[in-house]
Structure formats: C-alpha cells, structure tokens
Amino acid sequence: MPPLATMSSPGSLLLLTPAVYQGIGRNRGGQSQEGQSISSSRSLKTKLSVSARAVSSCEASMRITCCANQTQTARRKSFSGPTSPPSGSVKEKVRSPKLDDGGTGFPPFRFGGGGGGGGGGGSNSAGGFILFVIVLLLDYLREFERNLQNGTRRGSDYDNGLAPQ
C-alpha cells in the first residue's frame, strides 16, 4: 500500500491524489478484502485509522504552514511636515536664539548680560583701567611697608650723605 502523505521536513508537505485513498480498501489485485479473516479486517481498520490520523496530522501541519507563511503589511503614517494653525488663531512670534552682540560685560557663557568682546567687563566703566590703578596702589603699599621694616638697616638718605643741602 503506498503511503498517504510524506513529509521530508516540517515546512514541506506532499499530499497524494484521491485515487490512492480509494485503493485503501483493496488489496494489490484489486479485489475486495471483505471475504478475508477477522485479523485482516482488524489490520485494515488499523491501517485506515493510522491513515486517517496521518491525513489529519498532515492537514494540521498544512494549516500551521499556511499560517506561518502569512504576512501582514504594516502601514506607516507619513510625516506631512509642520502644519500652519487656522487663520483665526493667535500666532506666536517665533524667537530666534539670542546671539552675542559683542558688547561690553561678562562673556556670554556666564552671568548672562550678553557681554564679551571689547575691552573688559563692567557696564559703562573702563574696567581695565581700574584694575591697573589697584595694582599700582598695592605695589606702592608693598614698597612702603618694606621701607618701614628695613629702614634702619639700610639707613636713610641723611645717613648716606645724600641729603639736600
């Protein structure tokens, strides 16, 4: 008896024609098996039940294979870009980023004010000049203090004979 269905792999399934199914109840000579003994009818019933199970398992695997091969198309919403508001709505003014105008003041990364560029910090004052005056004052005070501490060791102008006459 030829097999009803063969499977080489789970994905491939070969089903046989209906003529093969009709030949199940006959032996090789084409004669009916009705006149044979009870044991042969049992084997025929066993073969039929086995073949029915094979066909049902083949159908189940075919359904699984068909389900596995189905695909689903995904639809992506297309981006339409920025849309304008309705004509009657209140429009907000679009602000551009605040750029450094090169004015006076602190550099733009710190303390705000948009300063940077130019000759030093401060609002309308010359900061560099004030710093220079402070440094000169500190230098003068340092020399004056040295003269007070070391004045007796070195002597004064009167001791060296450099006094005005």
From Swiss-Prot:
Induction: Induced by light in dark-grown seedllings. Highly expressed in leaves. Expressed in leaf sheaths. Expressed at low levels in stems. Residues 90-101 have a biased composition (Basic and acidic residues). One of its GO terms (cellular component) is chloroplast. Its main location: plastid. Interacts with atpB. Required for photosynthetic protein complex assembly in chloroplast thylakoid membranes during leaf development. Maintains the abundance of the core protein complex PsaA-PsaB of photosystem I (PSI) in the thylakoid membrane. May play a role in the efficient biogenesis of the chloroplast ATP synthase complex, possibly by interacting with the beta subunit atpB. This is Protein YELLOW LEAF 1, choloroplastic.
